[in-house]
Structures are given as structure tokens and as C-alpha cells.
Amino acid sequence: MNTVIPYNNPHYRDYRPALGVPEDQIIPITDQLGFHPAMAPLKKYWDEGKLAIIQGIGYPNGSLSHFRSMDIWATCEPEELGLTGWLGSVIQDVDPKGENVLTGVNFGRGLPRSLAKEGVPVASVGDLGTYGLLTEIGAEAQRAEALDLFGRMYAPAIGQGVVDDYIRRTGIEALKGADILGTAPGMYKSEVEYPSSAMGGYLRDMAQVHNADFGTRVLFTTAPYNIFDTHANQAVGHANLLQDVSSSIDSFMADIRQLGKSDNVTLFFYSEFGRRAMDNGSGTDHGTGGVAFVLGDNVKGGLYGEYPSLEPNKLEDGGNLQHNVDFRSAYTTLLDGWMGLDAKAIIGGAFEPVPFL
């Protein structure tokens, strides 16, 4: 509610007496909705018709646990604990013989569960500027030490019980990927400035890898901070975070456009859940129905789904917003419409696509 703001709904001020954004600071996108002022860098893409907003995104019986909800988004398994990441399946479908060790790349530390699948190599880049150091690992003992490091990085994503076999299957490929990725900075020339934050760095690295034409089809990153969990001090903290993310994404888009590499990129960004309708005096607690964004030169911008009702009798238990778009519907559009894959097989069912492509 403080990201895409229902500024003309009287319940917004009722529910957010401490945290409501002043109306004269809101950036209108319709006569009912507006962006938080810190999202100003993204407004141009809305005006271009290249930014889609999916309102009320979530899933039935939404979990209020960060870890469980992230797992559900990662594995498309709301009813049971899944081990296979949906993007891990995408990487395998795109490259079933495993011929390209860089079909999928994570920008950040460790291996997010979304990318985890047995036998599927994924390189994780903490800092592309120093990633080439791995190319110097030559001796067998040093390579073994590196594989042990990969094991400790990847265990949280796939479980310690299967990590040894996973590393045996994927660790060597990941090291090969490191050798190749280390060449990307030398192919990149750009004057676009990025924020000097972790997110800015990850997206700059992402632009370099995309520019290098390694055949990478899945580029993934996660905001490297947990302070989007704004139970307190939300007014300042949320604004700073939105500014960082919006500016980083704007820099990335400007970069790949000036590089002539934007026609085959679609960005999908989301949070694993929304926030409670009512503020707690300083912040907001875990909620359900949230918002997701899709950005790219091939995106049909606009609003998709309905903004969750703020009527008191339409809120879920605890004062949470109802979801009205299943996140797997957005995945369906990305998989069928963008990647040309069988979404049903990957996400485990048929879901009505969201027509943003």
C-alpha cells in the first residue's frame, strides 16, 4: 500500500495514520493509484508503456513466514516442501544436455532455492570484478577446496543430505563458469552510473554478463538485505530501499538500452508477500496480497489484476489484503510467452496467464 498507493481511497489514511505518504508527494499513475516518491526513476517506463504492475499477487492461504513464503515462490509447492526450484527446471529445459554452464547465473552469494535442481549447474557471482580470481584455481587440492566452499554455500538451498552428490554433479561446471564469467568485464564499455549499493553492483554485473552474450537465459538476484521487513522505522527505511531498487533498475535499463541489448530482456521483480493494511505506529507487519512488476521493451505496460479491496469486511483475518492473482499465473506468462517453455510441467499445473506480453 505504500509502494503502489491507493491515494484516493479514504481507508488508506484510516489504515496508515502514521505511515501514509503525503498526497502532494505521491506520483500519480492513475486517478486512483500512485507511486511512492522514491520510485520516481521508474515512472518513465510507466509512461512509455513498458512497466506492468500485477496487483494483489499471492497464493491461497498465504504464509506469513518469510522462509516458507520464499520457498513457495521458489518451488511452486504451496502444499508441501519442495526441493526443486522453478528456475532450475527452466535452465534444464532450455539446456537439457547441460552444454552451457552459464545458462543460469545468480548475482549474489550462495544459491537461491529458485535456481536449485539436481544436476543443474548455476554460477553465483558475488562481485564480478573479483570473480576472475577463480580462474587461477588450477591445482587439484585448490579445486577441491573450492568445491568444499561451493558445498557450504549451496547446502542451505538443497539440504545437507544431498549436497555432496549435488556438488559432484555441478561444482566442476560452476568452476568452468567462473573461468568464463571472469572475461565479461573486458567486453563491457559503459558510462552509465549505478548506485554504490549491493543492488547497484549486482545489476551492473548482470548487465555485463548479458552484454557478453554467453548464452545466459536466466539472470537472478535477490535484494541483499532483510530490511524490507519494515516492522519499524518504515517511513525512512522503506523510502531508502525503494530509491535504491528503483535507481538500480533504471541504471540497468539505461545500460542495456545504450548497449543495444534490451530487446531480449524482461525483468520480473517481486516480494514474497505484502504488508498488513494497518500500520503499527512505526511500521507494518507481514501481510498477504502484494504487488509485482514486469519491465522490458516487449512488455505491455499497465495494471493487471485488481487492487485488493480495502473495505474492512473484505480484509482477511488479521487485517490482510486478499490476493486475486496467483503468482504462478505470472510465471505462466513468463514461461509460455517469453521463454517458449511448457509452463504447466514446470509449475505443476495450469494457471491463467497474465497478458503483460
Residue ranges and their predicted role:
Residues T216, S262-N264, Y270, G287-G290, ...:
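Active-site lining segments that contact anionic ligands and/or coordinate catalytic metals
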Residues T221-P224, F268-Y270, L295:
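Generic beta-strand/beta-sheet core signal
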Residues S271-L303:
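Histidine-centered active-site microenvironments of extracellular/periplasmic hydrolases
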